[in-house]
Amino acid sequence: MMAPSIDTMAEELDTSITESTMALSVYLLATAFGPLIIGPVSEIYGRKSIFHITNIWFLVWNLVCGFAHSKGLLMAARLLAGFGASAVYSLGYGVLGDVWSAEQRGRSLSLYLLIPLTGSAVGPIVSGFIVKYSTWRWMFWSTAILQLTLDLSSLLFHESYAPLLLRRRAEELRSNTGGSRYHAAIEMREAGLSPPRKLSRSLSRPLRLLAFHPIIQMQAILEGIDYGLLYFALSSFSALHVAAYGESVEISGLHYIVICIGTVSGSQLCGPLMDYAYQRLSSNTGETQVPELRIPLLLPGALITPIGFLLYGWAAQYHLIWVVVDVGAALLSLGMQIFDTTLHAYVMDSYPEHVSSASAATQVLRSLLAFAFPLFSNSLYDSLGYGLGNSLLAFLSIGIALPATGILWRWGATLRGRQQSSY
């Protein structure tokens, strides 16, 4: 949402463009480390309570952003707001894994992703008009008003984490019957562990997954590069239309509609196709609950993404009509969304009891690269231009995605079989 207002904020707060871009990117830095705490803690205390706490945290610091009168306070508040918002990266996928079966994974992901993906594209459009007719501070205040509404509606949510619900049920049965024979599986597994030991073991889980589980390592690298490249290309998307096509800030923000079209189309196409392909492959092979049956859908995403990069880059390089640039950006976001949605489903299938921790582990590299890549986008495009610059990104994307798809399809089950327990 901040992208169209970077120049305005830089002027008012007396910062450089790089420093203003840092205020945009530091939010992503928080989303790298927030899930490392939020995800595993939700597997101890439940999704519901952690969800309420992080919602309030985000609301408070988002308001502070709107009142910031120095670049230091703005960056600090953005960092802390990002920590609260990062809950969605672990709790969201955790709830999906709690509620929907593997056969419904695609449908649940497509429904879940619809609103955040739409919001990520509509946000810059709205902020462009806010900057034009009001002040950039209302970007944060209006978001806080919406967040307050969502916080109130979230009071209707129920706990969904099965191990915690079973623990509570076992405790209730022991209390009501006076017997000690009722125990949940998680209680048996954690027998003899002190509360600090349980907490430390849970908090270390995402890092243990990232350090010792090849599946998590591969997804972290793939999603990190994908997400970083997307932010790299799109961090200058609005500025391109202002500089090359002479558009105003608020009109340039309208071009983010094509990003919305690409990402939403990717998620909504991928969901039903994923469920259909999974059920068809399960029927043909006679195997069920095999995460590798998700892998074939990575291929179209891996191929569409570089096409989008090339079209976007060379159309911008030769100042072709803006429609061509936008089609390239739409294809780029479409391919990446198909690829990332499929990867998420694969990891959710691989770690059904620790979806939040697994999502947190993969989120680290994803957010770090999304934080770092935009800092160098202006330098790359100034040196190589949009054509060669995006060609480099296209070859990097396909050069990593295609081999990784083959490795997961051929050796994914073997890698999963050799990994340590996620407990």
Swiss-Prot record:
Induction: Expression is induced by the developmental and secondary metabolism regulator veA. It comes from Aspergillus flavus (strain ATCC 200026 / FGSC A1120 / IAM 13836 / NRRL 3357 / JCM 12722 / SRRC 167). Belongs to the major facilitator superfamily. The chain crosses the membrane at residues 21-41, 49-69, 79-99, 111-131, 138-158, 220-240, 256-278, 295-315, 319-339, 360-380, 392-411. GO terms for molecular function: transmembrane transporter activity. The gene is mfs2. One of its GO terms (cellular component) is membrane. One of its GO terms (biological process) is xenobiotic transport. Its main location: membrane. This is Probable efflux pump mfs2. It is a multi-pass membrane protein. Probable efflux pump; part of the gene cluster 27 that mediates the biosynthesis of asparasone A, a sclerotium-specific anthraquinone pigment important for sclerotial survival. Disulfide bonds: none annotated. It comes from the Eukaryota. Signal peptide: none annotated. Keywords: Membrane, Transmembrane, Transmembrane helix, Transport. It is found in: Membrane.
